[in-house]
Amino acid sequence: VANADEIGIEAPKNRIGDAVRTWVRSFSGFQKKALVRSAKKGDTWRFVSDEGPYLNGHDAACCPLAFLSCGMVTSYMSEIMALAEQQGVEIRKLKLIQDNYYTMQGSMMKRTMVGGAENIELQVEIDCDLDDMALNEFLVNATYASPLNGLMRGQVESLFKLSKNGAELPTAGALELDGAILPDPSDYFANAVPMAAVDGLMSKVGPTPKKEVSGGTA
């Protein structure tokens, strides 16, 4: 987004590494639009998402979890390259193939739906001079350092601040965020201007094959 300052989306205070602020607007069905601003770099990205036929969606864009999977494997790649530079390991070739599996049971309409996630499958193709034992330790240490791994290793309590039509609502059983209510983004989404067009950032290649997993469907 070229005019993030103009439309008013500001990044939160950067406490550790990076902090992001996300504005999300819901459309019909499962379609959503989001603006995400990074405190570290100041960049603002526009995302759209949808769901496929498994949730009666139109499959007009990636599902939200696809962005998580993409960010996860990108984080692993960054950590591997950073550790290689730190330890003086020359990597001549590196390719990561990651499969994420998510489960779903029950009905959203009946409020009985329960979602879950299976273990991630990460395949690493690498050409370097480390022997097998040293390479395994190197890759484990690199992927372990990913911020995503920190989120997945334990249970994290989220903090909430709720409002409706500008009036604050109680969070009930959820933990409350200590801070003021942020203003409604209103129609600022429509005023977002894209940067110079860049083709090929994402392209659709087809539906993900369904895989039977324990406890639900992928």
Give, region by region, the residue ranges found by the protein language model.
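Conserved phosphate/anionic-ligand binding catalytic regions in large, soluble enzymes, centered on
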Residues: E79
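Alpha-helical metal-binding/catalytic segments enriched in His/Glu/Asp
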Residues: S75-Y76
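Extended beta-strand/beta-hairpin segments
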Residues: V1-S69, A82-A218
